[in-house]
UniProtKB/Swiss-Prot annotation:
Subcellular location as annotated: Plastid, Chloroplast
Entry GO MF terms: aminobutyraldehyde dehydrogenase (NAD+) activity; betaine-aldehyde dehydrogenase (NAD+) activity
Main localization (coarse): plastid
Similarity section: Belongs to the aldehyde dehydrogenase family.
One Pfam family matching this protein: Aldedh
Transit peptide: first to last position: 1-7
Pathway the protein takes part in: Amine and polyamine biosynthesis; betaine biosynthesis via choline pathway; betaine from betaine aldehyde: step 1/1
InterPro entries: Ald_DH/histidinol_DH, Ald_DH_C, Ald_DH_CS_CYS, Ald_DH_CS_GLU, Ald_DH_N, Aldehyde_DH_dom
Residues at the catalytic site: 260, 294
The organism of origin for this protein: Amaranthus hypochondriacus
UniProt protein name: Betaine aldehyde dehydrogenase, chloroplastic
Catalytic reaction(s) noted: betaine aldehyde + NAD(+) + H2O = glycine betaine + NADH + 2 H(+)
Alphabetical GO biological process terms: cellular detoxification of aldehyde; glycine betaine biosynthetic process from choline
Length: 501
Protein backbone atom coordinates (compact mmCIF):
# COMPACT_ATOMS: atom_id res chain seq x y z
CA UNK A 1 0.00 0.00 0.00
CA UNK A 2 1.33 3.42 -0.99
CA UNK A 3 2.25 5.89 1.74
CA UNK A 4 2.54 9.65 2.04
CA UNK A 5 5.79 11.12 0.75
CA UNK A 6 7.25 13.46 3.40
CA UNK A 7 8.05 17.03 2.44
CA UNK A 8 11.70 17.80 3.14
CA UNK A 9 14.16 20.64 2.64
CA UNK A 10 17.86 20.52 1.79
CA UNK A 11 20.06 18.93 4.46
CA UNK A 12 22.98 21.27 5.19
CA UNK A 13 25.17 21.39 8.30
CA UNK A 14 22.94 18.94 10.15
CA UNK A 15 19.78 20.98 9.59
CA UNK A 16 16.88 21.18 7.15
CA UNK A 17 17.22 24.38 5.10
CA UNK A 18 14.96 25.82 2.45
CA UNK A 19 16.72 26.40 -0.89
CA UNK A 20 17.88 29.98 -1.26
CA UNK A 21 15.73 30.41 -4.39
CA UNK A 22 12.83 28.52 -2.75
CA UNK A 23 12.17 26.41 -5.87
CA UNK A 24 10.85 22.85 -5.78
CA UNK A 25 10.56 19.99 -8.28
CA UNK A 26 7.47 17.76 -8.50
CA UNK A 27 7.79 14.04 -7.76
CA UNK A 28 5.90 11.91 -10.29
CA UNK A 29 5.01 8.31 -9.46
CA UNK A 30 5.96 6.47 -12.69
CA UNK A 31 3.35 3.76 -12.11
CA UNK A 32 0.43 6.22 -11.95
CA UNK A 33 1.85 9.36 -13.66
CA UNK A 34 0.53 11.33 -10.68
CA UNK A 35 2.35 13.99 -8.66
CA UNK A 36 2.91 12.61 -5.16
CA UNK A 37 5.02 15.37 -3.64
CA UNK A 38 8.00 17.57 -4.38
CA UNK A 39 11.68 17.98 -3.55
CA UNK A 40 13.75 21.12 -2.96
CA UNK A 41 15.72 22.41 -5.95
CA UNK A 42 19.23 23.41 -4.93
CA UNK A 43 21.31 25.87 -6.92
CA UNK A 44 24.91 27.07 -6.84
CA UNK A 45 24.20 29.23 -3.79
CA UNK A 46 23.09 26.18 -1.82
CA UNK A 47 26.13 24.25 -3.02
CA UNK A 48 28.31 26.99 -1.52
CA UNK A 49 26.64 26.57 1.85
CA UNK A 50 26.89 22.78 1.78
CA UNK A 51 30.56 22.71 0.76
CA UNK A 52 31.40 25.27 3.45
CA UNK A 53 29.59 23.13 6.03
CA UNK A 54 31.50 20.05 4.89
CA UNK A 55 34.81 21.92 5.17
CA UNK A 56 33.96 23.08 8.70
CA UNK A 57 33.12 19.52 9.68
CA UNK A 58 36.60 18.41 8.61
CA UNK A 59 38.35 21.12 10.61
CA UNK A 60 36.15 21.21 13.71
CA UNK A 61 38.17 20.62 16.88
CA UNK A 62 41.30 20.33 14.71
CA UNK A 63 39.75 17.36 12.95
CA UNK A 64 39.28 15.33 16.12
CA UNK A 65 35.50 15.25 15.73
CA UNK A 66 35.67 13.40 12.41
CA UNK A 67 38.58 13.49 9.96
CA UNK A 68 41.30 12.70 12.51
CA UNK A 69 39.12 10.61 14.80
CA UNK A 70 39.69 6.88 14.94
CA UNK A 71 37.99 4.63 12.43
CA UNK A 72 36.31 2.96 15.39
CA UNK A 73 34.72 6.29 16.33
CA UNK A 74 33.30 6.76 12.83
CA UNK A 75 32.19 3.12 12.71
CA UNK A 76 29.77 3.72 15.58
CA UNK A 77 27.87 6.23 13.47
CA UNK A 78 27.84 3.98 10.41
CA UNK A 79 26.43 1.10 12.45
CA UNK A 80 23.81 3.38 13.98
CA UNK A 81 22.75 4.45 10.48
CA UNK A 82 22.56 0.80 9.38
CA UNK A 83 20.43 -0.11 12.39
CA UNK A 84 18.03 2.77 11.82
CA UNK A 85 17.63 1.90 8.13
CA UNK A 86 16.92 -1.72 9.02
CA UNK A 87 14.34 -0.52 11.53
CA UNK A 88 12.66 1.55 8.79
CA UNK A 89 13.13 -0.99 5.99
CA UNK A 90 9.46 -1.25 4.97
CA UNK A 91 9.10 2.53 4.96
CA UNK A 92 12.18 3.04 2.80
CA UNK A 93 11.19 0.26 0.39
CA UNK A 94 7.73 1.72 -0.16
CA UNK A 95 9.14 5.19 -0.82
CA UNK A 96 11.62 3.72 -3.29
CA UNK A 97 8.90 1.82 -5.16
CA UNK A 98 6.71 4.93 -5.41
CA UNK A 99 9.56 7.21 -6.43
CA UNK A 100 11.26 5.20 -9.18
CA UNK A 101 8.85 2.36 -10.04
CA UNK A 102 10.98 -0.45 -8.67
CA UNK A 103 8.99 -3.59 -7.70
CA UNK A 104 8.49 -3.59 -3.95
CA UNK A 105 10.31 -6.91 -3.50
CA UNK A 106 13.35 -5.48 -5.30
CA UNK A 107 13.21 -2.28 -3.30
CA UNK A 108 13.18 -4.26 -0.05
CA UNK A 109 16.28 -6.18 -1.15
CA UNK A 110 17.97 -2.88 -2.00
CA UNK A 111 17.30 -1.53 1.49
CA UNK A 112 18.80 -4.67 3.02
CA UNK A 113 21.88 -4.01 0.88
CA UNK A 114 21.98 -0.38 2.02
CA UNK A 115 22.12 -1.43 5.66
CA UNK A 116 24.67 -4.12 4.83
CA UNK A 117 26.87 -1.60 3.03
CA UNK A 118 26.95 0.74 6.04
CA UNK A 119 27.79 -2.24 8.27
CA UNK A 120 30.57 -3.37 5.93
CA UNK A 121 32.19 0.06 5.85
CA UNK A 122 31.92 0.31 9.62
CA UNK A 123 34.15 -2.78 9.64
CA UNK A 124 36.45 -1.16 7.07
CA UNK A 125 36.70 2.00 9.18
CA UNK A 126 37.84 -0.07 12.15
CA UNK A 127 40.27 -2.01 9.97
CA UNK A 128 41.76 1.29 8.81
CA UNK A 129 43.06 1.93 12.33
CA UNK A 130 45.15 -1.25 12.18
CA UNK A 131 46.58 -0.28 8.77
CA UNK A 132 47.94 3.08 9.93
CA UNK A 133 51.72 3.44 10.13
CA UNK A 134 52.24 0.27 8.11
CA UNK A 135 56.07 -0.08 7.85
CA UNK A 136 57.89 0.00 4.52
CA UNK A 137 61.05 -2.08 4.14
CA UNK A 138 63.99 0.13 3.10
CA UNK A 139 67.48 -0.73 1.84
CA UNK A 140 69.11 1.64 4.39
CA UNK A 141 69.16 0.94 8.14
CA UNK A 142 69.48 4.61 9.03
CA UNK A 143 65.92 5.40 7.91
CA UNK A 144 62.50 4.17 8.94
CA UNK A 145 59.46 4.60 6.72
CA UNK A 146 55.74 4.10 7.22
CA UNK A 147 52.49 5.02 5.50
CA UNK A 148 49.57 7.08 6.77
CA UNK A 149 46.13 6.83 5.18
CA UNK A 150 44.22 10.08 5.59
CA UNK A 151 40.85 11.30 4.29
CA UNK A 152 41.05 13.02 0.93
CA UNK A 153 38.86 15.86 2.25
CA UNK A 154 35.51 17.19 1.08
CA UNK A 155 33.98 14.93 -1.56
CA UNK A 156 31.17 15.58 -4.02
CA UNK A 157 29.00 12.51 -4.60
CA UNK A 158 26.58 12.40 -7.54
CA UNK A 159 24.31 9.35 -7.68
CA UNK A 160 21.76 7.97 -10.19
CA UNK A 161 18.06 7.14 -10.09
CA UNK A 162 18.03 3.39 -10.81
CA UNK A 163 19.17 2.38 -7.32
CA UNK A 164 18.47 5.69 -5.56
CA UNK A 165 19.53 4.97 -2.00
CA UNK A 166 21.79 1.98 -2.66
CA UNK A 167 24.08 3.70 -5.17
CA UNK A 168 24.21 6.78 -2.97
CA UNK A 169 25.27 4.50 -0.11
CA UNK A 170 28.02 2.94 -2.26
CA UNK A 171 29.59 6.40 -2.15
CA UNK A 172 28.49 7.81 1.20
CA UNK A 173 29.44 4.82 3.39
CA UNK A 174 33.09 4.46 2.27
CA UNK A 175 33.61 8.22 2.14
CA UNK A 176 32.46 8.59 5.75
CA UNK A 177 34.39 5.50 6.82
CA UNK A 178 37.55 7.10 5.42
CA UNK A 179 36.96 10.28 7.43
CA UNK A 180 35.82 12.50 4.56
CA UNK A 181 32.93 14.91 4.74
CA UNK A 182 30.53 14.80 1.82
CA UNK A 183 27.96 16.62 -0.26
CA UNK A 184 25.57 14.16 -1.92
CA UNK A 185 23.56 15.19 -4.99
CA UNK A 186 21.12 12.42 -5.96
CA UNK A 187 19.24 12.37 -9.26
CA UNK A 188 16.24 14.66 -9.35
CA UNK A 189 14.22 11.72 -10.74
CA UNK A 190 14.53 9.73 -7.49
CA UNK A 191 15.66 11.65 -4.42
CA UNK A 192 13.09 10.80 -1.77
CA UNK A 193 14.98 8.05 0.06
CA UNK A 194 18.20 10.05 0.01
CA UNK A 195 16.42 12.84 1.86
CA UNK A 196 15.17 10.25 4.35
CA UNK A 197 18.80 9.15 4.80
CA UNK A 198 19.42 12.73 5.95
CA UNK A 199 16.72 12.32 8.58
CA UNK A 200 18.38 9.09 9.75
CA UNK A 201 21.71 10.92 10.05
CA UNK A 202 20.02 13.60 12.12
CA UNK A 203 18.41 11.00 14.37
CA UNK A 204 21.69 9.17 15.08
CA UNK A 205 23.52 12.43 15.81
CA UNK A 206 25.99 12.44 12.92
CA UNK A 207 28.16 15.54 13.46
CA UNK A 208 26.88 18.59 11.54
CA UNK A 209 28.30 18.99 8.05
CA UNK A 210 29.73 15.48 7.77
CA UNK A 211 27.01 14.59 5.26
CA UNK A 212 25.06 17.23 3.38
CA UNK A 213 22.34 16.27 0.89
CA UNK A 214 21.24 18.55 -1.93
CA UNK A 215 18.46 17.62 -4.32
CA UNK A 216 17.99 19.44 -7.59
CA UNK A 217 18.74 19.47 -11.29
CA UNK A 218 22.12 18.41 -12.64
CA UNK A 219 23.13 21.69 -14.30
CA UNK A 220 21.96 23.79 -11.35
CA UNK A 221 23.31 21.68 -8.46
CA UNK A 222 25.47 18.83 -9.77
CA UNK A 223 27.50 21.05 -12.09
CA UNK A 224 28.46 23.62 -9.43
CA UNK A 225 29.34 20.77 -7.06
CA UNK A 226 31.62 19.04 -9.58
CA UNK A 227 33.59 22.20 -10.36
CA UNK A 228 33.68 23.69 -6.85
CA UNK A 229 37.28 24.61 -5.92
CA UNK A 230 36.82 23.48 -2.32
CA UNK A 231 35.66 19.97 -3.26
CA UNK A 232 38.68 17.66 -3.21
CA UNK A 233 37.24 14.73 -5.17
CA UNK A 234 34.14 13.86 -7.18
CA UNK A 235 32.53 10.42 -7.49
CA UNK A 236 29.84 10.11 -10.16
CA UNK A 237 27.52 7.38 -11.40
CA UNK A 238 25.41 8.09 -14.46
CA UNK A 239 25.57 8.47 -18.21
CA UNK A 240 28.83 8.57 -20.13
CA UNK A 241 27.93 11.97 -21.58
CA UNK A 242 27.41 13.54 -18.16
CA UNK A 243 30.43 11.73 -16.74
CA UNK A 244 32.57 13.31 -19.43
CA UNK A 245 31.35 16.77 -18.34
CA UNK A 246 32.09 15.97 -14.70
CA UNK A 247 35.58 14.83 -15.64
CA UNK A 248 36.18 17.99 -17.68
CA UNK A 249 35.10 20.19 -14.78
CA UNK A 250 37.33 18.33 -12.34
CA UNK A 251 40.26 18.42 -14.76
CA UNK A 252 40.41 22.22 -14.58
CA UNK A 253 41.49 21.87 -10.94
CA UNK A 254 43.38 18.58 -11.38
CA UNK A 255 40.78 17.02 -9.11
CA UNK A 256 40.52 13.22 -8.85
CA UNK A 257 37.31 11.56 -10.02
CA UNK A 258 35.76 8.12 -9.90
CA UNK A 259 33.35 7.45 -12.75
CA UNK A 260 30.87 4.59 -13.15
CA UNK A 261 29.16 5.22 -16.46
CA UNK A 262 27.12 3.51 -19.17
CA UNK A 263 27.20 -0.02 -20.43
CA UNK A 264 26.09 -2.37 -23.19
CA UNK A 265 27.09 -5.64 -21.62
CA UNK A 266 27.08 -9.01 -23.40
CA UNK A 267 25.78 -12.36 -22.17
CA UNK A 268 27.32 -15.30 -24.04
CA UNK A 269 25.35 -18.57 -24.11
CA UNK A 270 27.17 -21.72 -25.26
CA UNK A 271 25.55 -24.86 -26.62
CA UNK A 272 26.01 -26.99 -23.47
CA UNK A 273 23.85 -24.94 -21.10
CA UNK A 274 20.66 -25.96 -19.35
CA UNK A 275 18.20 -24.00 -21.48
CA UNK A 276 15.76 -23.00 -18.75
CA UNK A 277 18.47 -21.95 -16.31
CA UNK A 278 20.19 -19.92 -19.03
CA UNK A 279 16.89 -18.37 -20.12
CA UNK A 280 16.08 -17.21 -16.60
CA UNK A 281 19.53 -15.69 -16.06
CA UNK A 282 19.28 -13.99 -19.46
CA UNK A 283 15.93 -12.46 -18.53
CA UNK A 284 17.14 -11.46 -15.07
CA UNK A 285 20.34 -9.94 -16.45
CA UNK A 286 18.42 -7.56 -18.69
CA UNK A 287 15.01 -7.05 -17.06
CA UNK A 288 15.89 -6.79 -13.35
CA UNK A 289 15.29 -3.24 -12.07
CA UNK A 290 12.91 -2.71 -15.00
CA UNK A 291 15.87 -3.01 -17.37
CA UNK A 292 17.47 0.11 -15.91
CA UNK A 293 20.84 -1.30 -14.89
CA UNK A 294 24.13 0.19 -16.06
CA UNK A 295 25.57 -3.33 -16.26
CA UNK A 296 22.47 -4.90 -17.89
CA UNK A 297 23.52 -7.82 -20.10
CA UNK A 298 21.42 -6.45 -22.93
CA UNK A 299 23.38 -7.98 -25.84
CA UNK A 300 22.58 -11.70 -26.07
CA UNK A 301 25.08 -13.86 -27.95
CA UNK A 302 23.83 -17.43 -28.33
CA UNK A 303 25.52 -20.36 -30.07
CA UNK A 304 23.96 -20.93 -33.48
CA UNK A 305 23.31 -24.63 -32.81
CA UNK A 306 20.80 -23.87 -30.03
CA UNK A 307 19.64 -20.39 -31.03
CA UNK A 308 16.15 -21.27 -32.28
CA UNK A 309 15.30 -23.51 -29.33
CA UNK A 310 16.84 -21.14 -26.79
CA UNK A 311 15.04 -18.07 -28.12
CA UNK A 312 11.73 -19.94 -28.09
CA UNK A 313 12.35 -20.85 -24.45
CA UNK A 314 13.45 -17.30 -23.59
CA UNK A 315 10.32 -15.76 -25.13
CA UNK A 316 8.18 -18.04 -22.96
CA UNK A 317 10.07 -16.93 -19.84
CA UNK A 318 9.66 -13.27 -20.77
CA UNK A 319 5.94 -13.57 -21.45
CA UNK A 320 5.57 -15.08 -17.99
CA UNK A 321 7.10 -12.06 -16.20
CA UNK A 322 4.47 -10.30 -14.12
CA UNK A 323 4.21 -6.64 -15.16
CA UNK A 324 2.16 -4.63 -12.70
CA UNK A 325 2.01 -1.84 -10.16
CA UNK A 326 5.18 -2.22 -8.04
CA UNK A 327 3.05 -2.74 -4.92
CA UNK A 328 1.15 -5.69 -6.39
CA UNK A 329 2.25 -9.04 -4.99
CA UNK A 330 4.59 -10.92 -7.32
CA UNK A 331 5.43 -7.90 -9.48
CA UNK A 332 8.66 -8.52 -11.35
CA UNK A 333 8.62 -5.60 -13.80
CA UNK A 334 7.43 -2.11 -13.02
CA UNK A 335 7.51 1.10 -15.06
CA UNK A 336 10.60 2.90 -16.25
CA UNK A 337 11.41 5.97 -14.19
CA UNK A 338 9.89 8.83 -16.21
CA UNK A 339 7.92 9.85 -19.27
CA UNK A 340 11.08 10.92 -21.09
CA UNK A 341 12.72 7.56 -20.37
CA UNK A 342 9.58 5.75 -21.54
CA UNK A 343 9.60 7.67 -24.82
CA UNK A 344 13.33 7.06 -25.25
CA UNK A 345 12.94 3.29 -24.82
CA UNK A 346 10.06 3.10 -27.31
CA UNK A 347 12.09 5.17 -29.77
CA UNK A 348 14.96 2.66 -29.55
CA UNK A 349 12.51 -0.14 -30.36
CA UNK A 350 10.95 1.68 -33.32
CA UNK A 351 14.40 2.56 -34.69
CA UNK A 352 15.44 -1.09 -34.47
CA UNK A 353 12.33 -2.05 -36.47
CA UNK A 354 13.03 0.59 -39.11
CA UNK A 355 16.61 -0.64 -39.43
CA UNK A 356 15.38 -4.16 -40.22
CA UNK A 357 15.43 -5.94 -36.86
CA UNK A 358 12.69 -8.34 -35.74
CA UNK A 359 10.72 -7.94 -32.50
CA UNK A 360 10.39 -11.46 -31.08
CA UNK A 361 8.27 -10.35 -28.13
CA UNK A 362 7.19 -7.19 -26.36
CA UNK A 363 7.96 -3.85 -27.94
CA UNK A 364 5.11 -1.77 -26.56
CA UNK A 365 2.98 -0.88 -23.54
CA UNK A 366 1.31 -3.86 -21.82
CA UNK A 367 -2.36 -3.91 -22.85
CA UNK A 368 -3.65 -4.25 -19.29
CA UNK A 369 -1.86 -1.13 -18.01
CA UNK A 370 -3.38 2.06 -19.37
CA UNK A 371 -1.40 4.42 -17.14
CA UNK A 372 2.21 4.49 -16.07
CA UNK A 373 5.47 4.32 -17.98
CA UNK A 374 5.39 0.58 -18.61
CA UNK A 375 7.26 -1.20 -21.41
CA UNK A 376 6.94 -4.94 -22.04
CA UNK A 377 10.09 -7.07 -21.82
CA UNK A 378 11.34 -6.86 -25.39
CA UNK A 379 13.58 -9.22 -27.37
CA UNK A 380 14.97 -8.06 -30.70
CA UNK A 381 16.66 -10.39 -33.21
CA UNK A 382 18.08 -10.07 -36.74
CA UNK A 383 20.39 -7.40 -35.41
CA UNK A 384 23.55 -6.23 -37.16
CA UNK A 385 26.53 -4.76 -35.33
CA UNK A 386 25.97 -1.40 -37.02
CA UNK A 387 22.46 -0.96 -35.60
CA UNK A 388 21.74 1.57 -32.87
CA UNK A 389 20.18 -1.13 -30.67
CA UNK A 390 23.49 -3.05 -30.69
CA UNK A 391 25.73 -0.07 -30.04
CA UNK A 392 23.86 2.27 -27.66
CA UNK A 393 22.65 1.88 -24.09
CA UNK A 394 18.85 1.73 -23.85
CA UNK A 395 18.35 1.69 -20.07
CA UNK A 396 15.06 -0.14 -20.34
CA UNK A 397 13.76 -3.73 -20.67
CA UNK A 398 15.13 -4.35 -24.15
CA UNK A 399 17.40 -7.24 -25.17
CA UNK A 400 19.03 -7.56 -28.60
CA UNK A 401 20.35 -10.88 -29.92
CA UNK A 402 22.94 -12.31 -32.30
CA UNK A 403 24.32 -15.80 -32.89
CA UNK A 404 27.93 -16.99 -33.02
CA UNK A 405 29.61 -20.13 -34.29
CA UNK A 406 32.93 -20.24 -32.47
CA UNK A 407 34.56 -19.16 -29.25
CA UNK A 408 36.69 -16.59 -31.07
CA UNK A 409 33.64 -15.10 -32.77
CA UNK A 410 31.84 -14.89 -29.43
CA UNK A 411 34.75 -12.97 -27.90
CA UNK A 412 34.96 -10.62 -30.87
CA UNK A 413 31.24 -9.83 -30.74
CA UNK A 414 31.24 -9.47 -26.95
CA UNK A 415 34.06 -6.93 -27.09
CA UNK A 416 32.48 -5.04 -30.00
CA UNK A 417 31.41 -2.07 -27.88
CA UNK A 418 32.71 1.23 -26.56
CA UNK A 419 31.67 0.12 -23.08
CA UNK A 420 33.30 -2.26 -20.62
CA UNK A 421 31.33 -2.54 -17.41
CA UNK A 422 30.18 -6.15 -17.18
CA UNK A 423 29.69 -9.40 -19.10
CA UNK A 424 28.31 -12.89 -18.51
CA UNK A 425 29.31 -16.27 -19.93
CA UNK A 426 27.22 -19.41 -19.50
CA UNK A 427 28.66 -22.87 -20.16
CA UNK A 428 29.20 -26.15 -18.33
CA UNK A 429 32.81 -26.10 -19.57
CA UNK A 430 34.55 -24.10 -16.84
CA UNK A 431 37.87 -24.07 -18.70
CA UNK A 432 36.10 -22.36 -21.58
CA UNK A 433 34.48 -19.93 -19.16
CA UNK A 434 37.91 -19.06 -17.78
CA UNK A 435 39.31 -18.41 -21.27
CA UNK A 436 36.36 -16.18 -22.12
CA UNK A 437 36.62 -14.37 -18.78
CA UNK A 438 40.25 -13.44 -19.44
CA UNK A 439 39.44 -12.22 -22.95
CA UNK A 440 36.48 -10.01 -22.06
CA UNK A 441 37.33 -6.29 -21.85
CA UNK A 442 35.21 -5.49 -18.80
CA UNK A 443 35.42 -4.76 -15.09
CA UNK A 444 33.15 -7.61 -13.92
CA UNK A 445 32.41 -11.06 -15.35
CA UNK A 446 29.59 -13.33 -14.23
CA UNK A 447 30.04 -17.05 -14.88
CA UNK A 448 26.81 -19.05 -15.22
CA UNK A 449 24.81 -16.13 -13.82
CA UNK A 450 24.22 -12.42 -14.46
CA UNK A 451 24.12 -9.36 -12.18
CA UNK A 452 24.79 -10.68 -8.66
CA UNK A 453 26.61 -7.89 -6.86
CA UNK A 454 28.20 -7.96 -3.41
CA UNK A 455 29.43 -5.14 -1.22
CA UNK A 456 32.67 -7.04 -0.60
CA UNK A 457 33.70 -7.25 -4.29
CA UNK A 458 35.09 -4.43 -6.49
CA UNK A 459 32.76 -2.68 -8.92
CA UNK A 460 33.71 -0.57 -11.94
CA UNK A 461 34.41 -0.63 -15.64
CA UNK A 462 36.83 -0.13 -18.48
CA UNK A 463 36.68 1.79 -21.77
CA UNK A 464 33.88 4.40 -21.74
CA UNK A 465 32.21 2.76 -18.77
CA UNK A 466 34.54 4.78 -16.56
CA UNK A 467 37.40 4.09 -14.20
CA UNK A 468 38.08 3.54 -10.54
CA UNK A 469 36.50 0.89 -8.35
CA UNK A 470 33.73 1.16 -5.79
CA UNK A 471 32.80 -1.38 -3.10
CA UNK A 472 35.03 -3.74 -1.15
CA UNK A 473 38.29 -2.49 0.27
CA UNK A 474 38.78 -0.64 -3.02
CA UNK A 475 35.79 1.56 -2.15
CA UNK A 476 37.36 3.10 0.93
CA UNK A 477 40.71 3.53 -0.85
CA UNK A 478 38.92 5.91 -3.24
CA UNK A 479 38.60 8.40 -0.41
CA UNK A 480 42.06 8.15 1.13
CA UNK A 481 45.32 9.99 0.52
CA UNK A 482 48.46 7.95 1.00
CA UNK A 483 51.21 9.81 2.88
CA UNK A 484 54.78 8.54 3.12
CA UNK A 485 56.57 9.35 6.40
CA UNK A 486 60.34 8.78 6.48
CA UNK A 487 62.44 9.33 9.62
CA UNK A 488 66.20 9.56 10.07
CA UNK A 489 67.08 7.12 12.85
CA UNK A 490 70.77 8.00 13.14
CA UNK A 491 71.80 9.63 16.43
CA UNK A 492 73.98 12.72 16.21
CA UNK A 493 75.89 11.75 13.08
CA UNK A 494 75.71 14.34 10.28
CA UNK A 495 74.36 13.34 6.89
CA UNK A 496 77.78 14.02 5.44
CA UNK A 497 76.87 15.25 2.00
CA UNK A 498 78.22 18.77 2.53
CA UNK A 499 81.53 19.75 4.01
CA UNK A 500 81.06 20.93 7.57
CA UNK A 501 81.58 24.73 7.91
Amino acid sequence: MAIRVPSRQLFIDGEWREPIKKNRIPIINPSTEEIIGDIPAATAEDVELAVAAARRALKRNKGEDWASASGAHRAKYLRAIAAKITEKKDYFAKLEAMDCGKPLDEAARDIDDVAGCFEYYADQAEALDAKQKAPIALPMDTFKCHVLKQPIGVVGLISPWNYPLLMATWKVAPALAAGCSAVLKPSELASVTCLELAEVCREVGLPPGVLNILTGLGPEAGGPLACHPDVDKVAFTGSTATGSKVMSSAAQLVKPVTLELGGKSPIVIFEDVDLDKAAEWTAFGCFWTNGQICSATSRLLVHESIAAEFLDRLVKWCKNIKISDPFEEGCRLGPVVSKSQYEKVLKFISTAKSEGATILCGGSRPEHLKKGYYVEPTIISDVSTSMQIWREEVFGPVLCQKTFGSEDEAIELANDTQYGLGAAVLSKDLDRCERITKALEVGAVWVNCSQPCFTQAPWGGTKRSGFGRELGEWGIENYLNIKQVTRDTSTDEPWGWYKSP
